[in-house]
Amino acid sequence: MQPFRGWTGTLILGMAIAGSLSGAQTARSAHDAARRRTDVRWQRAVEQAVREAPNARVLVLEASSGDLLASTRLAEAGRTLATPGSTLKPAILYFALASGRWDAERRVACSRRLRVGSHRLNCSHPIADPMNARQALTWSCNSYFAELAGTLSPRVLRQALEERGLLAATGLTAQEEIAAFREPRTREQVQLAALGVEGIRITLPELAEAYRSLAAEMAAHPETVATKTVSAGLRDSASFGMAGAASLGGVPVAGKTGTASAESGGATHGWFVGLAPAGSPRVVVVAVYLPSGRGSDAALVASKLLAHSPLRKP
C-alpha cells in the first residue's frame, strides 16, 4: 500500500461549547468558534449513522485545518473521560519505531492468553504464527504490545503520549476535560497504560486530535519504516483485521478499534478512529465513542457514516 501522503480532508471529533466568557477566554472562544463550520453533507451522514446508536459520540473534523464539520453529542464527547483500550497502539508503535526502540520485523509469539497484573487481556484474533509489527497492529495483538510496552520506561511512555498531544487540552472546546494519566511506576503499570486499560483516561477530542497528529507526522515522513509499518497496519486492520467492520461503508479506510471497561470493571465501551479514504490525498479522520458496546460496534457506526458521506461514490 502507499504511505499516507499529504493528507487533508476531514476528522471526526468532539467539542463542548462554553457559555459567557471574558478576556483571554473570549479570545479562545472566538478561536474555537472559527474552527466550527458545519458541512451539511457530513452532518447528514452523522445523523444517518447514529440512528441505530443514539448514544454514540461522533465528530467530523477537517484534517488539514482542524475545522469541525459535523458532530453529535458534542458536550458529552468533550466531557467524557474513558479508558482508551487498543486505540493507543498505533501511536506507541510509531514512536517506538521512529525512535529506534523497536524493530518492525521483531516477531512475538501469542498464545491468545495474557494476564497483566489483575487484568486478563486475552487476544481475540485467530491463531497465528509469531507476528511482526504490521501484523500485530492489524490484529491488535495484546501479547505483542505488552512485550513492546515492557521495553519502555515510564518516562518514555509519557513522551510517546505527549508527542501526539494525548495529555493536554486540545483547544477544541472551552469546557473540555483533560486526560487523566497516572504515572506508572512498574513494568506492569507501563504495559497496562500502553494497552489503554489502566492508568489513563482520555476524551474523544483528545483521541481524534492524536490521530490527526499521527497522520500529519506520517505524511511528513512517508518513506520511513515507522510510517510504512503503521500505515499498512491501520489499513489492514480496517480492511480485514480487528476493525474490519469499518470497511463495510464502501469507502477505503485505515483505522483502529478499542474496547475497554472502567478500571473497576463492568460493562465495556467502544472506540473507533479512522482515516478515509485510505492512501488518498483527501482524508477523513473518523472518531466514534460508544459508552456501551465494543470497538467493532463503533467501527460499524463509522462505516454507516462513510456510506452516507461525500466520500462514497455513487
Segments (PLM) and residue ranges:
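Active-site SXXK
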Residues: 46, 66, 81-108, 136, ...
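Beta-lactamase-like hydrolase cores
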Residues: 28-64, 70-71
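Bacterial N-terminal signal peptides that target proteins for export
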Residues: 1-11
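A penicillin-recognizing enzyme superfamily signal
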Residues: 40, 143-146, 150-158, 187-309
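Glycine-rich, acidic and aromatic/proline-enriched surface loops and short helix-turn segments
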Residues: 51-55, 61-71, 97-102, 113, ...
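Bacterial N-terminal signal peptides
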Residues: 10-20
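Active-site-proximal helix/loop microenvironment
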Residues: 70-72, 76-87, 130, 169-225
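Conserved catalytic neighborhood of penicillin-recognizing serine enzymes
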Residues: 102-158, 166-170, 187-195
